[in-house]
Structures are given as C-alpha cells and as structure tokens.
C-alpha cells in the first residue's frame, strides 16, 4: 500500500522519481551513450522539451556535474547522476 502524504520531502522525492522516469523514457532509444563530457550531454538533451526536476531544468543540472560523473554509460546512469544534483527543498 502506498502511503501518500503532503509532506514537502515526499513531494520532492516524487518529483525526482518522475524526472528520472522521463529522462530514461526520452533517452532509451537514443544512440548517444557513452556520454563523455558536459558538452556531449548538453547536445544530447532534448531541445525545447522541458525536463524539470522540481524547479530546475535538466540543462541547468548538467552544469553541476563534475568530470568524475563521466562517462555516463546509459539512460539509467544519466537519470541517477542528474537526479543526484536535483536540489530538494525541505
């Protein structure tokens, strides 16, 4: 049974989960992996499609990645790394 609550942390986690699902959905058919750096990732992100994590767009989250986050192996890896940069408002 799913416990639903209006707790802000719950809302934030739900946003992050949705963000990850949308990213994986978008990238699952794309032939862009491995992604070696921020430039490649920025080019791979959908143009004109909003992919927000909470208040922040995926393109903004890319700027927060470090060299240690690359290479990105697959859509799941990408979703996890970008979601980790997603700020959670509590």
Curated annotation (Swiss-Prot):
Protein name from the UniProt record: Uncharacterized protein MJ0738
InterPro entries xrefs: MTH865-like_sf, Uncharacterised_MTH865
A Pfam family: MTH865
